[in-house]
Amino acid sequence: MNRRLLLKGALGVGLAAGVGTLGRYTVLAPPPSGRRASVDELAAELVEALSPAARARALFPYDHPLRQYYNRGLWLGGLTVSAATLDWDTRRLLTDVMYAGLSDAGRGRVPFQDSTRFMGVNMMQLAVCGDPRVGPYQLLLSGVHLNLRLGSASPEGAAFGGPQVYGDQRGNERVGLPNNTYRYQLETAQRLVAALTPAERAHVRVARAPAQVIVGVQGAAGRFDGVPVADLAPAKRALAREVVAGILGTYADDSAAYAWQCLERNGGVDALHFADYDEDFEGGRRAGDGPSQIFRLEGPAAVFHFRGEPHLHAFINVTMDGERPLGVGEVLGHNPSVLEGDALRALFETAMRAQAEADVAYYPLDAIVGRLRAGPVHTGDLWVAESWVNDLVVVEAQGADLAPGLAAAMRSRGVVPDARSRYRIATIDYIARERVRELGRIGPARKSGALRDALVAHVRSRGFELDA
């Protein structure tokens, strides 16, 4: 299911609001019961209430890489919440779990962003890593512009158990994000920018934002955009702290308090850098001399990324130790150096070609939106680096029919295409379907499994060896 279909579904749910008692047990999402209990208590009750079929879809081992994965509302896997999968009482219990993970202010935000205000928990994906009845766990709710993590901090020291993702479509393509649930965060950041001197503004403004999903902590050796908050005057530092407080204030007091502990352990908000951006990573409207709607606060152990163009996608990642980031699943190998951009694409293409037994692999640079830190690499790290959840596919083409760019890439690797030969090309389903001109005149695509599985298999067997 994609976001457009889900938004259409939200309209259908809104129209169904008049179906009366029947709707209560079928289409409509339950409101919260008003019961006040802890997330842990409610999550344990929820798991107990799931049917065997629902448990089979929703429950995962605690060390499953799904616990590390995030994006801005792509389907993560798990159970699709609906009247067909959970009865009214269980969906109400899930609604109570969601509300318990939010502050009083947050209960007026997250449940009212985007289609959630019409659908509630309906059509969200539910995944529970671990078992809240007996041990550590993480409950994940994913919907339109939402990956909400509920449960205690991870043993790895990640606040919220890992990155939080939120957003809202309102104000789409409009200056100032009018009527957006999280507009207040933008306004506070813009007040900070307005308070800067011209020289400070020049250092804060960066031409192009990083990809929104790149929020892995970098540690002390990281490179951060913008200016150190510590270098600003006290009143401006107070505004930076107000930005962070406005973001963390959405979540339950105990969860937010742990995030603040993580920040203070690493120097507080003063240890972050503040930047705003002329243009998003994916392009679009440029800020020019006007206020930007994209900002980022980042330090060795924390990232706050607010992308308000064309509408809001926002990401939070805060951890206790920037040198020991969240890593879930099997340790596959040791990465000798940071991989991003062209270097990460080289790893992807090497794995794709080897796993698909292809002559050449093609993965576009503009689709690389991840980063692999140096050091031990877990299965979850590769799931995050391959953020789009694409399938690996194989297509075939005659040498004479290869796109010029692909033929040039082959020559750069010492393979001179023969017009009369037929070549196996490993790529991703999106390219074979939507951007076929980048490949040439090709035959039908044949699936070869999930790309992330190919990456895991390659790193497990060959480490970080790359094609020449």
Give the label of every model feature segment.
Residues 331-468:
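Catalytic centers of hydrolytic enzymes
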Residues 13-21:
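Terminal signal-anchor or tail-anchor transmembrane helices
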Residues 32-52, 57-62, 68-84, 95-99, ...:
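A cross-kingdom marker for long, charged
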Residues 20-30:
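Membrane-interface motif at the C-terminal end of an N-terminal transmembrane signal
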Residues 1-14:
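N-terminal secretory signal peptides and thylakoid transit peptides that target proteins
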Residues 89, 235-236, 419-421:
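A short, structured loop/turn motif at beta-sheet edges
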